[in-house]
């Protein structure tokens, strides 16, 4: 099998608009390619940064686009850690009339996490969410099997999951800002 090489990201922001005259809402998606593997030293910091930006209800994106402006039922971001090619995506489905405003606000929140330090409370809440999810997931046998498979298929160190919480809790506000600048374009 030949695995295609991911294309480089564009050098500037570009907007591709697809006009759908009968659509009642717009789906906005801000996306860039990333090269992030689970065995990368910045992996845990990227998880925390994404959680704060758009990985939960209290994230920057959701609080702005849903709670502050009422543009959407939910805004989110995600980042992949695929073995070959991955991407960062931030977006939401919004009313047509606020598409442009939602894009501006999404870019504003991405810029915020890249230029400002997250608060101690935001950092603590994101870490607590990962710790809680990790502990609960261990109660399912399928999770333990998936973790063992991940170690083999993703070239992870044998202690990857036994040091997972330690690495999550070691993430700093400086780490979040640094990785946001690297991975959230």
What name fits each language-model region?
Residues 158:
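Acidic/polar loop-and-plug regions of large Gram-negative outer-membrane beta-barrel proteins
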Residues 1, 108-117:
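A common structural junction motif
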Residues 1-39, 54-101, 122-129, 143-147, ...:
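Non-catalytic beta-strand/loop surface segments
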Residues 49, 103-110:
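Short amphipathic C-terminal alpha-helix that caps PH/PH-like domains
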Residues 133, 150-153:
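Non-catalytic accessory/assembly modules
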